[in-house]
């Protein structure tokens, strides 16, 4: 425990906040090109084939991003937009691909939560 005179001399050192999405460099989203599109399995106790893509960003970083929603049209050389946000059961996946932006199509036949999946409002009859 420091004395008051020590605090007057030095002061408290504030700890720097560590970014959860360092490759974005303080930007809300970044553009990149898919280098690999594949599926992977989650940590225990979950079981699935999660769709992920390895993306080379415009700032030179190469990151792993999650492709949310049912079905996708991504392949190698697809241009995508990524945002921050990790996937809890996939180690090393700290980014999400934005659906409905650039080369990534929105989710087809999506009725609820459409804005998160780039789905247009369905036509009323």
Swiss-Prot record:
Gene3D superfamilies: Nucleic acid-binding proteins
Presence of the UniProt keyword Metal-binding in the record: no
GO biological process terms held by the UniProt record: translation
Keyword Chaperone: no
Keywords, sorted A to Z: Methylation, Ribonucleoprotein, Ribosomal protein, RNA-binding, rRNA-binding, tRNA-binding
Annotated InterPro entries: NA-bd_OB-fold, Ribosomal_uS12, Ribosomal_uS12_bac
GO molecular function: rRNA binding; structural constituent of ribosome; tRNA binding
Source organism, top-level taxon: Bacteria
Cellular-component GO terms for this entry: small ribosomal subunit
Pfam families cross-referenced by the UniProt entry: Ribosom_S12_S23
Residues recorded as bearing 3-methylthioaspartic acid in the entry: 89
Disulphide connectivity of cysteines: none
Ranges annotated as spanning the membrane: none
Entry similarity comment: Belongs to the universal ribosomal protein uS12 family.
Quaternary context: Part of the 30S ribosomal subunit. Contacts proteins S8 and S17. May interact with IF1 in the 30S initiation complex.
Function recorded in the entry: With S4 and S5 plays an important role in translational accuracy. Interacts with and stabilizes bases of the 16S rRNA that are involved in tRNA selection in the A site and with the mRNA backbone. Located at the interface of the 30S and 50S subunits, it traverses the body of the 30S subunit contacting proteins on the other side and probably holding the rRNA structure together. The combined cluster of proteins S8, S12 and S17 appears to hold together the shoulder and platform of the 30S subunit.
Cross-referenced NCBIfam families: rpsL_bact
Name under which the protein is recorded: Small ribosomal subunit protein uS12
Biological source species: Clostridium botulinum (strain Eklund 17B / Type B)
UniProt lineage: Bacteria, Bacillati, Bacillota, Clostridia, Eubacteriales
Recorded name of the encoding gene: rpsL
